[in-house]
């Protein structure tokens, strides 16, 4: 069992308080978690900062996910490795505990991903203290409760090859097991610049993201030294979306921590996006 690492810091440690925080995030965004069956998206990008800063931005993606799937697919959550621990591409087979209960791991699907990939390891060390995947779970639990099934992948080796390997392995596993899969890329955008500077720098990456141009997105991150911490997970989502027939991304919300704190001199930027099918 993977125990919470950031409950009480990134989000409330008590069930009632966490539920209230999620409700507040949705209220600020003017959204609801209303189940539908549109099945019109293949992947999403969500931020992973403290809920008080980025929860309301994440709400945009999770509202669309709820509207797309009344029956949950397997959620493959790919997050960057901030701690440096464990395998460079680490897939967890554990169930994950949160204040809202146990998020069950789809161990069969995870093992199939490892079989279908070439560089993906079964490894728990990378996940032990990592927050980028953990903070996604309460929103998903709020939508799907005990029906939720997850496959967490912590990505330390962020490049085109690893991103493609994950995406292609997920698609192959989905086909072999005849199970619907959905990739959530966990990432914040530019860190610790003014809001104006962050928006200017992120615009280059967001343009490539919208056009589903993986090569251009990676080029902009490297060429401009963009501090998008989860660019590898985003590349995985982009490649998977393209494999599933998507031709663009839809930016649902772009904001920064200054929109909450009032300090626009040094911010962290956040983005919610989805990849529409067709």
At which residue positions do the language-model features occur?
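Short hydrophobic/aromatic beta-strand or adjacent loop that forms the aromatic wall/cage
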Residues: 268-272
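Active-site histidine-anchored catalytic micro-motif
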Residues: 1-248, 252-265, 276-278
